[in-house]
Regions:
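N-terminal maturation segment of proteins
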Residues: 1-181
Length: 181
């Protein structure tokens, strides 16, 4: 939202508020897809869940999410900066700025924060059944067939995944021998 939603007018700012209000529905959709994938055996590795949790916590840290915080969250600082710029450009007055700030705060607290809280809860729960060691696509349901499809559609080789794996094993052996010589 910060890097991709340009704000040059009041309409742009109200569109930002609309996007913030839609975050919860989109995150809920993403969680549903992740749960369905998990039921099919497609799971995210443990280390990735740690990143999801850590980044989500950081996104909803600071004002307006933490009432006692002395610092603004990155998104809240951005919103306040954009409102100040709209005022400086005489596109809004102080009353309009306060009203837009109030609407943005409500969207962040009532939609955005619960969306990230849901992501944190899902990732914390899913983490308990995530593999500690990342597994390749071949370990996923239909993964070997998918990998073969990728080889055929994304490369110019006629080699199979097994052929490429065998070449890799031979190269590792050759390089080890060369390094130890």
């Amino acid at each position: 939202l910060i890097n991709f939603h340009t704000i040059d007018s009041v309409d742009d700012f109200t569109a930002l508020i609309s996007r913030i209000n839609l975050v919860k529905a989109r995150m809920d959709d993403a969680i549903d897809v992740a749960r369905q994938s998990s039921q099919l055996g497609v799971v995210t590795p443990y280390f990735a869940m740690d990143g999801v949790i850590d980044q989500s916590v950081k996104i909803i840290s600071g004002q307006p999410f933490d009432a006692d915080s002395e610092r603004d969250s990155a998104l809240w600082a951005h919103i306040k900066r954009e409102l100040a710029e709209l005022q400086e450009a005489d596109l809004i007055d102080k009353t309009q700025s306060a009203e837009l700030e109030s609407r943005a705060r409500a969207a962040l607290i009532n939609s955005f924060a619960p969306a990230y809280e849901a992501i944190i809860a899902w990732a914390t729960e899913a983490r308990t059944s995530s593999p500690e060691i990342a597994t390749g696509i071949g370990s996923q349901p239909g993964g070997a067939d998918y990998y073969d499809h990728l080889l055929a559609s994304q490369t110019t080789t006629d080699l199979t995944a097994d052929d490429i794996h065998e070449i890799g094993l031979k190269e590792v052996s050759r390089l080890r021998t060369e390094m130890l010589a």
